[in-house]
């Protein structure tokens, strides 16, 4: 089949197969055809398309000015457009494109005419303005590295912030600033967010990873008198003064005594308040602790106080630090280290990039929080659609997958979901989605598929793995798929698939009319040759191997054992006629093939795996 733009039947008949090439997409493998489009004059194209493109630009906030109908982020005075020395001639609302623009030169707007791009570039170079965004970004990055190297401080890589400041300046100048060392007693995350998110500064760290009181500012001009430097230092110290006040106040407030205040804080309509949520998390976390063989009391205590930071002033100022600040508050009040860490990490992982909690108490608390949320929102039908996910449930479900897979654990997810549902009902909170268990299970498996695709695992292997095992075997599904994916294009992988396909193709053909019933047991008494005996011997060896596997299957060894059966399988097919005239012999040989396929299926169902 073809993929891409529509090709009519007449055109299709004129295409030579040698002109096509294959390409794998998310929807499968397709043939593609390269077509040359007709030649278009670039100048004409720019003149025609530029106003259309400008009109399609969307702004989060826009404004009108004067009597003009144009909506834009800021008032526009002119449009400069030159290509190959020629002026573009088009209208955009009340503005006409020309070779004239207005330059802010020493706080006075002056009209400026340009003949070509070269004159435009030279003019701004003389003003110290870097018009090329990539060059400007490169200049800023090099200056940041130079100053930090000279001061023996480290700047963490942050391309998003770098891109942002690159767009905010045209005449970049990097300034080294400081704040009072007394603020280093504040949690470093507060310092980082204050500088990075609120002020767009670059925080710095020493060689041990500790934050320092120095930061770098990307200014838009030279700071000859030091006013820009001192101004930025005043701004950050004012913010940190407020943060320090709230930090001292909040860390001393007794967490346990404040738990009851969560009763006044609604969680979500139909799902109770935050006090209700932590009661559910306590019980669900207790069930998870049984599977992890850790202290139920510690998990329950962690759950009881993990949301108290939501009522603090600091979380009001820094909402992105909820959980993390709870960890700091519990540490300041002398709680067990494992409890503090669990609280600090219970929102993680977020998406694909952030860290995954590794400690058992952190895993238990993070899983209980995520599963409770997923059950609640699916229960009241607040599910994601194809285009919208306002409550980030996909991210939460991905977090569940990562907690299981990246910690090499296995949980009875089906039972956890059932128990979470019962906890809502115990609180007389109505979950009216009758298909909740099934829908949430499928949703989690879809997120597992997404995770596996991001790990570059073949689609057919993903489908085969998921179809072979249920929701209680997430880790097994992933690990088996990874090992097979790594082997599939090697000789051993090809041996496995070719061996399986030779048997399954004959079986499928013989069983398609459903007139023949097989019992998955061949009778050695009616074997006619050693090839049948050798194949049965190999099957029994494989069966014994899989029967003796407990929890810890060596997936690589399993595949090697399957690959090593190729010789017996191919010798059987090369020397034995399955479709024998004697019906009993034919059926017995088909039984042998069914035994072979079902033995291979102990790893995964190979029927949907494609041959290369």
Residue ranges and their predicted role:
Residues 1-612:
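Amphipathic alpha-helical "coupling" segments that flank catalytic cores
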């Amino acid at each position: 089949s073809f993929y891409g733009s529509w090709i009519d039947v007449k055109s299709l008949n004129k295409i030579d197969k040698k002109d096509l090439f294959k390409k794998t997409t998310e929807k499968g493998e397709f043939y593609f055809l390269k077509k040359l489009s007709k030649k278009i004059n670039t100048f004409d194209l720019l003149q025609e398309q530029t106003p259309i493109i400008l009109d399609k630009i969307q702004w989060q906030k826009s404004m009108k000015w004067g009597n003009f109908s144009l909506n834009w982020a800021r008032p526009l005075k002119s449009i400069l457009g030159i290509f190959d020395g020629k002026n573009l001639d088009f209208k955009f609302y009340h503005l006409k494109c020309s070779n004239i623009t207005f330059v802010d030169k020493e706080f006075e707007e002056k009209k400026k005419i340009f003949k070509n791009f070269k004159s435009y570039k030279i003019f701004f170079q003389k003003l110290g303005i870097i018009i090329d965004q990539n060059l400007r970004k490169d200049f800023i990055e090099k200056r940041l590295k130079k100053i930090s190297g000279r001061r023996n401080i480290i700047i963490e890589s942050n391309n998003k912030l770098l891109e942002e400041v690159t767009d905010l300046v045209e005449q970049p100048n990097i300034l080294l600033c400081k704040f009072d060392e007394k603020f280093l007693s504040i949690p470093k995350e507060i310092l980082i967010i204050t500088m990075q998110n609120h002020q767009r500064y670059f925080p710095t760290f020493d060689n041990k990873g500790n934050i320092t009181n120095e930061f770098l500012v990307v200014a838009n001009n030279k700071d000859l008198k030091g006013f820009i430097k001192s101004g930025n230092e005043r701004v950050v110290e004012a913010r940190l003064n407020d943060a320090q006040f709230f930090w001292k106040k909040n860390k001393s407030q007794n967490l346990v005594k404040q738990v009851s205040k969560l009763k006044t804080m609604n969680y979500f309509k139909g799902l109770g308040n935050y006090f209700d949520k932590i009661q559910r998390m306590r019980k669900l976390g207790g069930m998870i602790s049984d599977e992890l063989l850790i202290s139920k009391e510690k998990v329950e205590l962690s759950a009881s106080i993990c949301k108290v930071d939501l009522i603090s002033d600091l979380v009001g100022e820094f909402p992105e630090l909820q959980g993390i600040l709870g960890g700091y508050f519990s540490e300041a009040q002398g709680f067990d280290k494992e409890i503090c860490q669990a609280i600090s990490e219970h929102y993680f992982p977020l998406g694909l990039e952030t860290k995954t909690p590794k400690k058992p108490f952190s895993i238990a608390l993070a899983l209980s929080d995520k599963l409770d949320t997923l059950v609640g929102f699916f229960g009241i039908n607040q599910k994601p659609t194809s285009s919208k996910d306002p409550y980030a449930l996909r991210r939460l479900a991905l977090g569940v997958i990562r907690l299981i897979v990246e910690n090499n654990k296995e949980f009875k997810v089906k039972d956890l979901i059932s128990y979470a549902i019962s906890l809502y009902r115990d609180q007389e909170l109505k979950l009216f989605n009758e298909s909740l268990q099934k829908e949430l299970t499928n949703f989690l498996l879809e997120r597992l598929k997404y995770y596996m695709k991001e790990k570059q695992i073949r689609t057919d292997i993903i489908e085969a793995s998921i179809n072979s095992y249920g929701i209680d075997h997430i880790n097994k599904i992933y690990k088996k798929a990874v090992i097979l994916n790594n082997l599939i294009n090697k000789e051993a992988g090809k041996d496995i698939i070719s061996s399986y396909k030779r048997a399954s193709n004959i079986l499928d053909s013989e069983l398609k009319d459903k007139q023949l019933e097989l019992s998955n047991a061949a009778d050695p008494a009616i074997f006619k040759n050693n090839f049948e005996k050798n194949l049965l011997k190999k099957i029994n060896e494989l069966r014994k191997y899989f029967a003796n596997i407990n929890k810890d299957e060596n997936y690589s060894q399993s595949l090697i054992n399957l690959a090593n059966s190729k010789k017996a399988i191919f010798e059987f097919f090369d020397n034995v006629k399955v479709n024998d005239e004697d019906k009993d012999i034919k059926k017995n040989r088909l039984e042998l093939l069914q035994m072979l396929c079902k033995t291979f299926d102990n790893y995964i169902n190979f029927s949907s795996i494609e041959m290369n």
